[in-house]
Amino acid sequence: MIDTLTIVRPDDWHLHLRDGDALADVVGDTARQFGRAIIMPNLKPPVTTTAQARAYRERILAALPAGTRFEPLMTLYLTDNTTPEEVRAARASGFVHGVKLYPAGATTNSDAGVTDLRRCAKTLEAMQDVGMPLLVHGEVTDPTVDIFDREAVFIDTVMQPLRRDFPALKVVFEHITTKHAAEYVRDAQGPVGATITAHHLLYNRNALFVGGIRPHYYCLPVLKRETHRLALVAAATSGHPRFFLGTDSAPHAKGLKEHACGCAGCYTALHAMELYAEAFEDANALDKLEGFASLHGPDFYGLPRNAGTLTLTRSQWQLPAEVPFGEQMLVPLRGGEMLRWKTV
């Protein structure tokens, strides 16, 4: 039995940090474990320009705890009006590392998202030309499509035409949740990668309904059936370089989760690597954690691997039931429960 595991310092390739006082309360949780993180742009208003990304980056750096070494990797929010010129400016900035596709209405703060990807053809061509990755929330928003099928339908109706029209465009299929997506990414031609969250590795959709509605397990894309969870575990632990860590840690105030119409998102930044270690240990694949968490992501993005290390030890500890979040409180996934790994 392994009791201590030291890996190259990991990165988080999909993270929500919010802004203002809330940002200040959560950014330290990520910086404590990760060297870098891809920062999602779905603020209100969204981060749609390089200038806005620069300003947000400066706010993140200012909010870091003293002595912290952490690099926020910024992204732009793709809209119907994003121009090729903005893409080229973003690429030249050195701090914008992706452009995020949110189908309009697909998730939190996505109302400004793309209504028809065909309107973005010139922008996507510019991204392909300059090597700017497209980060995709892979769900359709057609109300006639069952919520559990939205990812599979997205592959057929959006992803496949996108890859056909822009075969050299680097695409990250974010927070995949289905066997279909895992197989698509594994077998795709050209530069395609995928992030996988800890909660989608650990839980299936039953977790939403144990003893009643469990709002802190509600996220988008929603948890799927066990067949899909097992396929995600197989992908994450396979050692395949197209799969890498992205927490999709998404903090919402307790009152907005425990609500008649609660927000989607699980807060896992506080204990992300502990959760991933648990998932990989359950699959007898702790030896594959370093590749997934620390190596595959920077290799895909064309960035250097981190120089430092992170150590996890087998240690029972109780996760706080809730933590400060601006003027309110935030409930982490599994808040108040015991964990069996701890970062040191």
Swiss-Prot record:
Zn(2+) 1 binds at H14, H16, K100, D248. It is an enzyme of class 3 (hydrolase). Its cofactor is Zn(2+). The modification N6-carboxylysine is found at K100. The active site is at D248. One of its GO terms (molecular function) is dihydroorotase activity. Binds 2 Zn(2+) ions per subunit. Substrate binds at H16, L17, R18, N42, H137, L220, H252, A264. GO terms for cellular component: cytosol. It catalyses: (S)-dihydroorotate + H2O = N-carbamoyl-L-aspartate + H(+). InterPro entries: Amidohydro-rel, DHOdimr, Dihydroorotase_CS, Metal_Hydrolase. Pathway: Pyrimidine metabolism; UMP biosynthesis via de novo pathway; (S)-dihydroorotate from bicarbonate: step 3/3. It comes from the Bacteria. CDD domains: DHOase (cd01294). GO terms for biological process: 'de novo' pyrimidine nucleobase biosynthetic process; 'de novo' UMP biosynthetic process. Keywords: Hydrolase, Metal-binding, Pyrimidine biosynthesis, Zinc. Zn(2+) 2 binds at K100, H137, H175. It holds the Pfam family Amidohydro_1. Its EC number is 3.5.2.3. Belongs to the metallo-dependent hydrolases superfamily. DHOase family. Class II DHOase subfamily. NCBIfam families: pyrC_dimer. Homodimer. Catalyzes the reversible cyclization of carbamoyl aspartate to dihydroorotate. This is Dihydroorotase. The lineage of its organism: Bacteria, Pseudomonadati, Pseudomonadota, Betaproteobacteria, Burkholderiales. The gene is pyrC.
